[in-house]
């Protein structure tokens, strides 16, 4: 798959804004003239989303008003905007839905400059980027396979950085030719001393690039070191793959970002699964360093330690967020640790220097695989504490009771897809994955309060269905594309329905040739004639024969039928509420401090069904003085503030589109602001292109 949006029947969502944001007059602050930055992605190098700013308090947060709104004017149907803005010295840096980097006056929202990496020739489709890096008056950001360095004051490319065009090609230096594949970086890197350390996003079906984590010289763009997440001969972990897997295997990539302990000189990252996601006969073994938490020497890229959270992943159980650096109290002493959330709703807590588990884990026997050629891991490891923040298995007792008809529809689906174990392997009949492919935890990551030891995690409570089918090689689409897009041109997700209405034929050909997001490009593997056949199929539905099984070295015996969410007959979740939660986890005790439903469906609210929880994407920020601030909810388009001690809601505001991003907070001229990207676009929700900032009047 290369996108997460799911084209299934969903409840209708209003295409108009409930409330139009109105810019409030913001006077000069009298109490202070200080500036406080949000200097890096997620607020600090520890990725804690934490701030000591205290002008906005639990007592006055309900008085927040819109301070300014900036419209990128770049929204388009299906676009998303997941950027967490960086604020330095009164200037806000972020990205638009069309991947323009820009700078604003952080007090007024006035644009200072913008840089369009496409030169005004953006042709889509959507690509999600979650932020940028600002360091020593340079801005580093990624567009597809190009990593740019631009002047933070002018927005102009830095001459001579990388190649003569002012960018680094992320496809270079991966140990094998990947020019025809998609290699990008949806999450910004981090700077340590004079290197920019960054992970990548790559296709989740073969052909795919390896997920090397790399460090580039911030001054020149030269590659300083590289860590092979799919080990080469002689490297640790090589024997957990088939011989020569490093020459063809893909994935095991740190798509969710990296975290640096600046004092220790250590870099931490968590990886995704290996390609293919759901059938691993071509990658038999444990597959280090896929699905692993890894620590390296940030100076050299040398291995320090790892913990593999899932061996030989068959369920797309990527680690969904970068590690969070925390300090906790264990056995009466303070311990620097790494906290890692998972899609399954678990939290790993590891001693930072050694990777030692601070709470014990346990090994559990796993079901055997049923697909021909597949060999599943016989056991998997799970943390015993804290308890999971998401439900672990779907039974009849856990189905929806919204209406009798909804329950009957859900019961029919459950019985058609028997799943006696949470890790029942993918099958021809169908397997329920719960929590689903989008968690549990997701890429927004947790917020951490260093004073209380509480870790705040928003969670999706959604079941998905994976059903494998024998791969057809009778048609070009069946052999090359159905792995992600389903067996017809009207799949569950990502949808190709209506693509020809949004893109010209030339644009469709370009996407097939060059790839986009996690979709690979096929110009090298297929050639122009087959690419044109595929474009014709997308437009007309007319396919042509192929002999992929004998000509394609990456041919797989099975493919996933599609990405199906477990929904009732009206398009609502087929499981019992809550369908999304917000959780506070005590890392000192290993307990859940509180949990609440998070998000609502406006149509159900109108029917009297409130507090259901919904899909949510993006993280929270936590303040020293008692607030937890988060948008994230997909359907109600709200940003909210909660009492961090008990989850009581203190404030909410309507946004022009869903804030599927993490907010930033900062101070300019003595006034504190909260800003959120309002990009929408998730699960067929309306797309937006604005940034909204709030402040006290």
Language-model-derived ranges and their functions:
Residues 44, 390, 397-411, 415, ...:
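Periplasmic c-type cytochrome electron-transfer domains
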Residues 38-42, 78-100, 124-147, 181-207, ...:
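Repeat-blade elements of multi-bladed beta-propeller folds
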Residues 3-18:
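Bacterial N-terminal signal peptides that target proteins for export
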Residues 59-73, 101-122, 147-180, 212-248, ...:
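Extracytoplasmic/lumenal domain signature
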Residues 32-77, 85-87, 583:
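Mature N-terminal segment immediately following signal peptide/propeptide cleavage
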Residues 138, 184, 266, 475-478, ...:
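Extracytoplasmic electron-transfer domains, predominantly the class I c-type cytochrome c fold
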Residues 360-417, 573-580:
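Glycine-rich (often Gly-Gly/Gly-Pro-rich) flexible segments and glycine-rich loop motifs
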């Amino acid at each position: 798959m290369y996108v997460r949006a799911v084209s299934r029947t969903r409840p209708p969502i209003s295409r108009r804004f409930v409330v139009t944001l109105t810019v409030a007059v913001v006077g000069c602050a009298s109490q202070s003239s200080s500036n406080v930055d949000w200097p890096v992605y997620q607020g600090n190098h520890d990725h804690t989303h934490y701030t000591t700013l205290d002008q906005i308090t639990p007592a006055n947060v309900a008085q927040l008003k819109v301070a300014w709104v900036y419209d990128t004017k770049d929204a388009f149907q299906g676009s998303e905007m997941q950027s967490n803005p960086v604020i330095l010295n009164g200037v806000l840096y972020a990205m638009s839905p069309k991947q323009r980097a820009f700078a604003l006056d952080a007090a007024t929202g006035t644009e200072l400059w913008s840089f369009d990496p496409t030169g005004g020739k953006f042709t889509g489709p959507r690509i999600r980027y979650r932020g940028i890096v600002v360091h020593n008056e340079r801005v580093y950001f990624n567009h597809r396979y190009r990593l740019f360095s631009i002047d933070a004051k002018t927005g102009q490319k830095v001459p001579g950085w990388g190649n003569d065009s002012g960018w680094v090609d992320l496809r270079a230096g991966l140990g094998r030719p990947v020019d025809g594949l998609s290699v990008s970086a949806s999450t910004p890197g981090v700077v340590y001393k004079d290197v920019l350390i960054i992970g990548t996003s790559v296709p989740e079906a073969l052909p795919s690039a390896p997920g090397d984590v790399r460090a580039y010289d911030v001054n020149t763009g030269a590659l300083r070191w590289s860590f092979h997440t799919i080990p080469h001969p002689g490297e640790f972990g090589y024997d957990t793959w088939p011989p020569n897997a490093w020459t063809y295997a893909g994935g095991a990539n740190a798509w969710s970002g990296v975290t640096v302990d600046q004092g220790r000189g250590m870099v931490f990252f968590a990886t995704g699964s290996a390609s293919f996601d759901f059938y691993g006969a071509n990658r038999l073994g444990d597959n280090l360093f896929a699905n692993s938490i890894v620590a390296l020497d940030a100076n050299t890229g040398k291995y320090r330690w790892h913990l593999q959270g899932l061996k030989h992943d068959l369920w797309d159980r990527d680690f969904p967020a970068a590690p969070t650096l925390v300090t906790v109290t264990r056995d009466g002493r303070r311990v620097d640790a790494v906290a890692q959330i998972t899609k399954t709703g678990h939290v790993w807590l590891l001693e930072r220097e050694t990777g030692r588990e601070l709470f014990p884990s346990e090994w559990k026997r796993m079901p055997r695989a049923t697909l021909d050629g597949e060999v599943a891991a016989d056991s998997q490891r799970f943390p015993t504490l804290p308890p999971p923040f998401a439900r672990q298995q779907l039974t009849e007792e856990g189905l929806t009771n919204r209406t009798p008809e909804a329950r009957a529809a859900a019961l029919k689906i459950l019985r058609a897809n028997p799943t006696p174990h949470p890790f029942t392997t993918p099958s021809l009949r169908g397997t329920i994955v719960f929590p689903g492919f989008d968690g549990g935890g997701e890429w927004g990551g947790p917020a951490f309060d260093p004073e209380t030891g509480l870790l705040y995690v928003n969670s999706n409570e959604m079941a998905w269905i994976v059903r494998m089918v024998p791969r057809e090689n009778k048609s070009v689409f069946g052999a090359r594309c159905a792995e992600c897009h389903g067996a017809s041109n009207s799949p569950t997700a990502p949808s190709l329905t209506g693509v020809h209405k949004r893109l010209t034929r030339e644009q469709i050909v370009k996407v097939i040739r060059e790839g986009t997001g996690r979709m690979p490009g096929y110009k090298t593997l297929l050639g122009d004639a087959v690419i044109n056949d595929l474009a014709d199929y997308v437009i007309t539905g007319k396919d042509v024969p192929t002999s992929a099984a004998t000509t394609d070295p990456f041919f797989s015996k099975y493919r996933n039928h599609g990405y199906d969410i477990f929904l009732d007959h009206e398009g609502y979740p087929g499981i019992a509420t809550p369908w999304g939660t917000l959780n506070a986890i005590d890392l000192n005790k290993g307990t859940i401090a509180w949990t609440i439903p998070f998000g609502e469906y406006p149509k159900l609210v109108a029917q009297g069904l409130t507090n259901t929880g919904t899909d949510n994407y993006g993280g929270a920020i936590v303040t020293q003085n008692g607030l937890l601030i988060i948008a994230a909810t997909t359907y109600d388009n709200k940003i909210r503030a909660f009492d961090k001690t008990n989850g009581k809601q203190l404030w909410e505001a309507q946004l022009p589109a869903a804030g599927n991003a993490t907010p930033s907070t900062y101070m300019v001229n003595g006034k504190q602001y909260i800003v959120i990207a309002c990009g929408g676009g998730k699960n067929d929700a309306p797309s937006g292109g604005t940034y909204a900032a709030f402040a006290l009047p």
